[in-house]
């Protein structure tokens, strides 16, 4: 065919120049080529030489660090320019196709312009990244020339009467506007940067974020193209495939996205709302307004992107309609009408009537639609993440000011706060993600219905009505689904609570043979949970069924109705497949409706919770007395502490309405020697609850400065409450508290240090920091060293002194990593005594002037207590003139006290020195003296020295105790430490990256059973085959409608043709009905499969764990086991079934679509291969990165929630130390770490979806082009073209979901893998050699114990802890066992219950070798009380007698023996009174007494007490000892002594050392031997 730039026709007007060259169209087109050629020739050398790639003087880790003015506008204009140029090229090709010869000038200039536009943006990007703006002069010239030449062309078109009816005229006008705007952008860069025409160019600094090498999240800084396509993630995804992603890889957040920045933005919004709404500044409405004020703009941007994406989504059906309609016509060639300038220009209608043009437009619309959609998702999620971080920071700041009483027994619990942080903030985040749907869904529905009506007419309203009318049903199902989920969550929480209790008390359960009771208790709750899960599965399957069946039903009703009621209008392929695509679009927002409504309701509830939390009571500063000395004496040196609790919901009490006056009146009334006192309380009444009875009444005390003050009293008299009241943690009803303002806050610490500030910033308290060690040790999940130093500067000498004073060095030596060992959450890897000593060590290490110690000796034996008292409290603190307040039951230390405060029933019984008590409180003093039974100080020091001298080696290492008090001897320390390091090394987390866990997948599916699995596979395959058959039949049916006349259809009568149509409709109806039924079958099958697997795996796991040996629980972290029952079971219960359904559906839909396209156009297979290779590598790289980022998102959320939990639990300690600001800084770090992981995960998901959807768009383009080509050559019907295009769009929609679901399934199958790993745990051997019939029912009835050559170890790989022990215990004897830590005392007691490996020797009880007994029989016939009290949530009756074997009288008798009868009678419900989880509503001593009562209930002939009275005061302990001796006079009692004096009345005393019996005789005999070890113990305990 002839080819020339201006054409080859001799008569062509293109060569005429008689009216001037500018009136020659070909010349004007040639003139338009000049600017483009100029740019290409100028820029290519610069790009290749490397001007644009040179880096700036500021060296940073990536290049895109600077944006010139108008950066985004330039990119937007360039994209529009490229689109218009593509249209111009296409228009030129179509216009040129009319004539025989080819006119290159119609499309070649546009092609050159397209190349130049791409070159311009590449050139600009390189100039921008190199920060060399002077080179932009080339673009300035180019835009000027292009604008001028294109303007000339536009004017000449107008002169030759070429107007809006010709598309070329419209495109030229748009190009003039675009070139002009780009020229203005370039001029604006000159104006701002002044790189030419000005003497002094304006320097621009790089963004502050990018000067920090740690900022690697580049989304805010890259150019617009990279932002839209997430191109910058390519390098990150590629790197992630080579090495694991960790926090160092994702580094820091940009400043604008950090929690502190967003928190400040939120605070500004809250302040603005507070000024507007003074009545309820923390109300729900005010919170919503503040959130919208702070984050609303980004939400509007996301909504704009979403609306644009939804509107562009309708391009697919419209283009399908146009393409199929064009191919369905007989004549595909339009006839030319009029020529202008020697050529013919097509109109817009002719342009849009071309199938190839529509295919290209469909491709571009899909690209743009997917880009806008992903941009909307990203902006919404980013906004939600920023909002979440801001709210979490605000919650934390509120916690720092909350009343302790409100946390401990008020409206807000620690669990509720953690839920607020972990759940409610996420609810708000996801609401912001779904929020744009609230206003985009109506737009999508309205436009969809209008287009359906335009294409189908009235019959379209039938199908639309079906979809819309079923929306309330969907909402109803979604509501029921939400209710079922909520009920499931309640039962799940109850089950986890019971499981947690069961695991924490596993040692007690095994010792008491209660495993089956608590296992049944968990199974009962699990059955309730499974009932809820079945309801959840039913509604989920209905929801899935409706999602898949409604489009089929709508299409069926619409099309059958169309041919039935509108017989004059046939169902053409263009109408059918365009309508089919529109129905799929229309269904989407209605599916989302239920999710959006649920999310909105949840967000409203969450904001209400947040409002209640933010409005809760706070501790606020009272007005303080002036710091200057008052005119009268030195009274002004005392200031009020911040004790006032402000409740924003209630008016302040009248008694504390104005405390400034009373305080100023009270302050001068102090004695003149006020400077000698640290703190003084006058007439104080304190309570825990706002309206409760005062816990402390009429408190008037003075704590001397620089001296040791001891607070003593019986259990529950208010000693700990007094400390907390002094620290300002209780609600003060009346009275005043004064702190000496001249007290230095700490030694060597600048009082103006910013670290001393509280989290509130401006709310600085007058009291200085107080080193506080609570009765219940509070530890961080950090190293031992970090817990002791507590973020204070490390002082090696002082650190060693503190370690020595607390006797921690032996314990540190056996830890896997010494003092760098992570101690676990709540110090779970340590024993009670170790936790207590680390807590005390923290208080000793701090250089504060005031130290409060709340019962630090409770979990320590006599030697540790004496050493701590002497080396720690006396030498480190008192001798250093620091004020020490010590709460204790150890009355033998009273002579060391400078000041004593005696409490009774919440009041001060007496305060003074010990001599004061001797003079004025003779009876009380004599009582103390009896309890103390002390000898003079010189003898005590002498015996201590003798004891130290008698030790074979000083500092003998003690074995590390487990959380249940397990004691190992020193010989196994090395081995145990090595094993601990190998099995549970919390100090270093090994990042393992596995491939797709196919084995776990096989185990999951095989757990469902062969029948259910077969049904699942068969129904899924059959369903998708039927769905393809429906659409294929529709193509055949609509193709038949293209034959216009009955004759052409080979029908003699019109009735026959109607019959033909009815056959098509009938078959279509049958196929659709079968498809709907199969949708129901598959949805039910997949959910029931998930239920069966969940039920089977949980039952297997529970049975395996409950039967596991105690060694398993001692070497496996409790949190790890609990996670299997919580998160992993939840994943299997609720997530895997839905993910499995989505994965199978999306995969089979993609396979079906590709199969149909390949069938329609086999040549598509050629293009499919490279696309498949690209998809494979994308999914391969994405899965690895997604798995790492998902795990990182989860692992960074755990420390965040744990930090909140730690803060709530240790709030008193944090506020006492004045460490609010430090902990808030940690919170910001944890929040930012979690947010950066979430943002990278979001960006990775967007990267995947953009890649896969762009590939999907390529599939659509290739499928469209090949289908059109085949159809034009009469090789393909229009119906099959429509079928192929519809399925091509389906690939575009489901390709990314397939990869996403595959990645999700890979992560979720990890739960199955972990559970199966636990199922391999070996169970204890519960079976015995003796048949139950051979064991007497009342065995053991005498209590005779024979121990013959007994050797015991904890594991076959470890060395013995008891060696060749031989002894005889006669019936009814009372045996006392003592020895140093690690001597084997507890191992001796555990041997009776076969809790340890008795590899040699035997124990014979009443003539029966216990090794031959079934474990349950043995353990149920003995009784033991452990050192650590264990109580379970439930009634007192359940805790005493879970087997329900005893009468009420027996239970009351046991309570009376344990000194608890009066306490329980005072409770509402008596024996049915509720004990909270862990017995938190009782004191430590009372919990231990309940455990004693529980043992008394069993009434066995052998009774073992393992340091059972450690947490009880001496008076109560003495009473109990007498009661035990009386109540168990005829029983054998083995007592392991914590306080040696408690076994002085025993018949025999056994002293153990290194697992062997050192001494065994009557206590009188051993005491008479001055060199006996027992005698030295007694002297030290006095």
Curated annotation (Swiss-Prot):
Domain of life, per lineage: Eukaryota
Residues holding ADP: 1381-1382, 1384-1387
> Which residues are listed as membrane-spanning?
31-47, 73-89, 107-123, 137-153, 170-186, 304-319, 357-372, 439-454, 461-473, 542-557, 577-592, 1014-1031, 1068-1084, 1144-1161, 1163-1175, 1250-1265, 1282-1297
Entry's InterPro entries?
AAA+_ATPase (IPR003593), ABC1_TM_dom (IPR011527), ABC1_TM_sf (IPR036640), ABC_transporter-like_ATP-bd (IPR003439), ABC_transporter-like_CS (IPR017871), ABC_transporter_C-like (IPR050173), ABCC8 (IPR000844), ABCC8/9 (IPR000388)
Asked if Iron is a keyword of the record, the answer is no
Q: How is its activity regulated?
A: KATP channels are regulated by cytoplasmic ATP/ADP ratios; ATP inhibits the channel by closing the pore, while ADP activates the channel. Activated by phosphatidylinositol 4,5-biphosphate (PtdIns(4,5)P2).
- Keywords from the named record: ATP-binding, Cell membrane, Disulfide bond, Glycoprotein, Magnesium, Membrane, Metal-binding, Nucleotide-binding, Receptor, Repeat, Transmembrane, Transmembrane helix, Transport
Q: Where is this region: Disordered?
A: 741-766, 939-962
Q: What membrane topology does the annotation report for this chain?
A: Multi-pass membrane protein
Q: Name one GO cellular component term.
A: protein-containing complex
* Principal location class: membrane
Residue numbers binding Mg(2+): 720, 775
SUPFAM superfamilies from the entry?
Answer: ABC transporter transmembrane region, P-loop containing nucleoside triphosphate hydrolases
Family annotation (Gene3D superfamilies): ABC transporter type 1, transmembrane domain (1.20.1560.10), P-loop containing nucleotide triphosphate hydrolases (3.40.50.300)
List the subcellular locations. Answer: Cell membrane
Q: Where is the ABC transmembrane type-1 domain?
A: 299-602, 1013-1307
Q: Which CDD domains match?
A: ABC_6TM_SUR1_D1_like (cd18591), ABC_6TM_SUR1_D2_like (cd18602)
Give the signal peptide range: none
Q: Which residues lie on this side of the membrane: Cytoplasmic?
A: 48-72, 124-136, 187-303, 373-438, 474-541, 593-1013, 1085-1143, 1176-1249, 1298-1582
According to the UniProt topology, which residue ranges lie Extracellular? 1-30, 90-106, 154-169, 320-356, 455-460, 558-576, 1032-1067, 1162, 1266-1281
Basic and acidic residues compositional bias, start-end: 939-950
Q: What does this protein do?
A: Regulator subunit of pancreatic ATP-sensitive potassium channel (KATP), playing a major role in the regulation of insulin release. In pancreatic cells, it forms KATP channels with KCNJ11; KCNJ11 forms the channel pore while ABCC8 is required for activation and regulation.
The text of the family note is: Belongs to the ABC transporter superfamily. ABCC family. Conjugate transporter (TC 3.A.1.208) subfamily.
Q: What is this protein called?
A: ATP-binding cassette sub-family C member 8
Q: Which organism is it from?
A: Cricetus cricetus (Black-bellied hamster)
Source organism phylogeny: Eukaryota, Metazoa, Chordata, Craniata, Vertebrata
């Amino acid at each position: 065919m002839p080819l020339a730039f201006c054409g080859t026709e001799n008569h062509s007007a293109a060569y005429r120049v008689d009216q001037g060259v500018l009136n020659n169209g070909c010349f004007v087109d040639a003139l338009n080529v000049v600017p483009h050629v100029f740019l290409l020739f100028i820029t290519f050398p610069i790009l290749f030489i490397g001007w644009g790639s040179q880096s700036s003087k500021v060296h940073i880790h990536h290049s895109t660090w600077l944006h010139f003015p108008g950066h985004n506008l330039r990119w937007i204009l360039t994209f529009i320019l490229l689109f218009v140029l593509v249209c111009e090229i296409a228009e030129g090709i179509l216009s040129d196709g009319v004539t025989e010869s080819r006119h290159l000038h119609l499309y070649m200039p546009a092609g050159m312009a397209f190349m130049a536009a791409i070159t311009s943006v590449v050139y600009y990007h390189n100039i921008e990244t190199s920060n060399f703006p002077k080179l932009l002069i080339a673009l300035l010239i180019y835009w000027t020339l292009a604008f001028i030449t294109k303007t000339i062309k536009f004017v000449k078109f107008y002169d030759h009467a070429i107007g809006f009816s010709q598309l070329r005229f419209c495109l030229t006008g748009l190009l003039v506007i675009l070139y002009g705007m780009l020229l203005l952008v370039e001029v604006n860069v000159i104006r701002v940067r002044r790189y030419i025409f000005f003497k002094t160019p304006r320097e621009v600094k790089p963004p502050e974020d990018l000067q920090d090498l740690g900022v690697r999240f580049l989304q805010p800084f890259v150019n617009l193209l990279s932002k839209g396509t997430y191109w910058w993630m390519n390098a990150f995804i590629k790197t992630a495939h080579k090495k694991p992603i960790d926090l160092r890889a994702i580094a820091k957040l940009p400043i604008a996205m950090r929690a502190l920045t967003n928190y400040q933005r939120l605070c500004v919004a809250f302040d603005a709302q507070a000024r507007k709404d003074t009545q309820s500044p923390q109300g729900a409405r005010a919170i919503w307004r503040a959130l919208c004020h702070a984050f609303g703009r980004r939400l509007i941007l996301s909504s704009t992107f979403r609306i644009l994406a939804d509107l562009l989504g309708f391009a697919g059906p419209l283009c399908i309609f146009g393409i199929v309609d064009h191919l369905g016509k007989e004549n595909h060639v339009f006839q030319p009408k009029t020529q202008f300038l020697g050529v013919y220009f097509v109109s817009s209608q002719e342009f849009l009537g071309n199938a190839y043009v529509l295919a290209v437009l469909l491709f571009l619309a899909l690209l743009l639609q997917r880009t806008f959609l992903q941009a909307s998702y990203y902006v919404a999620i980013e906004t939600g993440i920023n909002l979440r971080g801001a709210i979490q920071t605000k919650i934390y700041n509120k916690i720092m000011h909350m009343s302790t009483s409100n946390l401990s027994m008020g409206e807000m619990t620690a669990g509720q706060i953690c839920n607020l942080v972990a759940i409610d903030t996420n609810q708000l985040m996801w609401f912001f993600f779904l929020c744009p749907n609230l206003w985009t869904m109506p737009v999508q529905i309205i436009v969809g219905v209008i287009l359906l009506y335009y294409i189908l007419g009235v019959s379209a309203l039938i199908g639309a009505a079906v979809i819309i009318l079923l929306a309330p049903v969907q909402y109803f199902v979604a509501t029921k689904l939400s209710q079922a989920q909520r009920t499931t969550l309640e039962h799940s929480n109850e089950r986890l609570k019971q499981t947690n209790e069961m695991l924490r008390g596993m040692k007690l359960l095994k010792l008491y043979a209660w495993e089956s009771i608590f296992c049944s208790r968990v199974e009962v709750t699990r059955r309730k949970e499974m009932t809820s899960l079945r309801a959840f599965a039913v509604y989920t399957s209905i929801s899935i069924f409706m999602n898949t069946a409604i489009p089929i039903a709508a299409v069926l009703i619409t099309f059958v109705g169309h041919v039935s009621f509108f017989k004059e209008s046939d169902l053409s392929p263009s109408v059918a497949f365009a309508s089919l695509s529109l129905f799929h679009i229309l269904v989407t927002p209605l599916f989302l409706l239920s999710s959006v409504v649920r999310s909105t309701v949840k967000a409203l509830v969450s904001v209400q919770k947040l409002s209640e939390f933010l409005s809760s009571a706070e501790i606020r500063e009272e007005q303080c007395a002036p710091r200057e000395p008052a005119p009268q004496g030195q009274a002004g040196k005392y200031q009020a502490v911040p004790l006032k609790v402000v409740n924003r919901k209630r008016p302040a009490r009248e008694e504390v309405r104005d405390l400034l006056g009373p305080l100023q009146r009270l302050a001068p009334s102090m004695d003149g020697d006020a400077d000698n006192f640290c703190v003084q309380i006058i007439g104080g009444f304190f309570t825990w609850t706002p309206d409760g009875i005062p816990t402390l009444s009429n408190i008037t005390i003075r704590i001397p400065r620089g001296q040791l003050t001891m607070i003593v009293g019986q259990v529950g008299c208010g000693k700990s409450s007094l400390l907390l009241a002094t620290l300002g943690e209780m609600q003060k009803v009346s009275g005043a508290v004064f702190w000496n303002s001249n007290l230095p806050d700490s030694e060597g610490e600048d009082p103006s240090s910013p670290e001393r500030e509280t989290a509130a910033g401006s709310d600085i308290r007058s009291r200085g920091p107080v080193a506080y060690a609570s009765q219940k040790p509070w530890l961080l999940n950090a190293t031992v060293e970090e817990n002791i130093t507590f973020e204070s500067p490390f002082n090696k000498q002082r650190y060693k002194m503190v370690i020595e004073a607390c006797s921690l060095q032996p314990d540190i030596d056996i830890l896997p990593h010494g003092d760098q060992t992570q101690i676990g959450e709540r110090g779970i890897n340590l024993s009670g005594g170790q936790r207590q000593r680390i807590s005390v060590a923290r208080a000793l290490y701090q250089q504060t002037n005031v130290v409060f110690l709340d019962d630090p000796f409770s979990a320590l034996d006599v030697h540790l207590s004496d050493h701590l008292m002497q080396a720690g409290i006396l030498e480190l603190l008192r001798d250093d003139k620091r004020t020490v307040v010590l709460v204790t039951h150890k009355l033998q230390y009273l002579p060391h006290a400078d000041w004593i405060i005696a409490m009774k029933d919440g009041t001060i019984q007496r305060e003074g020195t010990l001599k004061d008590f001797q003079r004025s409180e003779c009876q009380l003093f004599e009582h103390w003296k009896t309890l103390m039974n002390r000898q003079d100080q010189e003898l005590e020091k002498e015996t201590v020295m003798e004891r130290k001298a008698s030790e074979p080696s000083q500092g003998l290492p003690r074995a590390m105790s487990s959380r249940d008090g397990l004691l190992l001897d020193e010989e196994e320390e090395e081995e145990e430490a090595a094993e601990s390091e190998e099995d549970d090394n919390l100090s270093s987390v090994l990042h393992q990256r596995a491939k797709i866990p196919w084995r776990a997948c096989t185990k999951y599916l095989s757990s469902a059973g062969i029948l259910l699995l077969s049904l699942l596979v068969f129904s899924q395959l059959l369903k998708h085959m039927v769905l393809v058959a429906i659409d294929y039949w529709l193509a055949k049916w609509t193709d038949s409608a293209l034959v216009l006349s009955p004759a052409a259809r080979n029908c003699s009568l019109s009735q026959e043709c109607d019959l033909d149509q009815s056959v098509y409709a009938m078959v279509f109806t049958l196929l659709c009905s079968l498809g709907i039924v199969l949708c129901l079958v598959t949805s039910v099958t997949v959910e029931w499969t998930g239920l069966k697997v969940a039920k089977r795996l949980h039952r297997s796991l529970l049975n395996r764990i409950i039967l596991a040996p105690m060694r398993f629980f001692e070497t496996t972290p409790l949190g790890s086991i609990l996670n299997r029952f919580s998160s992993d079971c939840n994943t299997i219960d609720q997530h895997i079934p839905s993910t499995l359904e989505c994965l199978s559906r999306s995969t089979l839909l993609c396979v079906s679509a590709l199969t149909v396209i390949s069938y329609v156009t086999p040549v598509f297979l050629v293009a499919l291969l490279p696309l498949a290779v690209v998809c494979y590598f994308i999914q391969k790289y994405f899965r690895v990165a997604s798995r790492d980022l998902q795990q990182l998102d989860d692992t960074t959320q755990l420390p965040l929630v744990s930090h909140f939990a730690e803060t709530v639990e240790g709030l008193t300690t944090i506020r006492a130390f004045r460490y609010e600001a430090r902990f808030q800084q940690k919170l910001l770090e944890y929040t930012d770490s979690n947010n950066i992981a979430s943002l990278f995960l979001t960006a990775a998901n967007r990267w995947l979806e953009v890649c896969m959807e762009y590939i999907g768009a390529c599939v659509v383009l290739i499928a469209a082009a090949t289908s059109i080509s085949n159809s034009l050559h009469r090789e393909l019907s229009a119906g099959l073209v429509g079928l192929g295009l519809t399925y091509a769009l389906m690939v575009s929609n489901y390709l990314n979901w397939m990869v996403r679901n595959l990645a999700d399934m890979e992560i979720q199958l990890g739960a199955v893998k972990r559970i199966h790993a636990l199922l391999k745990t070996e169970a204890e051997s519960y079976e015995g050699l003796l048949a139950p019939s051979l064991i007497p029912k009342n065995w053991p009835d005498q209590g005779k114990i024979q121990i013959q050559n007994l050797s015991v170890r904890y594991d076959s790989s470890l060395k013995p802890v008891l060696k060749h022990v031989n002894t005889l215990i006669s019936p009814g004897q009372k045996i006392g066992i003592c020895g140093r830590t690690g001597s084997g005392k507890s191992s001796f007691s555990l041997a009776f219950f076969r809790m340890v490996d008795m590899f040699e020797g035997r124990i014979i009880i009443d003539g029966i070798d216990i090794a031959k007994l079934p474990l349950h029989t043995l353990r149920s016939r003995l009784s033991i009380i452990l050192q650590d009290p264990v109580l379970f949530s439930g009634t007192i009756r359940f805790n005493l007698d879970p087997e329900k074997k005893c009468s009420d009288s027996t239970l009351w008798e046991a309570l009376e023996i344990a000194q608890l009868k009066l306490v329980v009678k005072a409770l509402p419900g008596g024996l049915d009174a509720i004990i909270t989880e862990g017995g938190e509503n009782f004191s430590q001593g009372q919990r231990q007494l309940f455990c004693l009562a529980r043992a008394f209930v069993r009434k066995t002939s052998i009774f073992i007490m393992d340091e059972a009275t450690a947490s009880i005061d001496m008076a109560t302990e003495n009473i109990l000892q007498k009661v035990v001796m009386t109540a168990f006079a005829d029983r054998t009692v083995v007592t392991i002594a914590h306080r040696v004096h408690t076994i002085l009345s025993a018949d025999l005393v056994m002293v153990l050392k290194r697992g062997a019996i050192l001494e065994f005789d009557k206590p009188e005999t051993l005491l008479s031997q001055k060199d006996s070890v027992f005698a030295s113990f007694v002297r030290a305990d006095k």
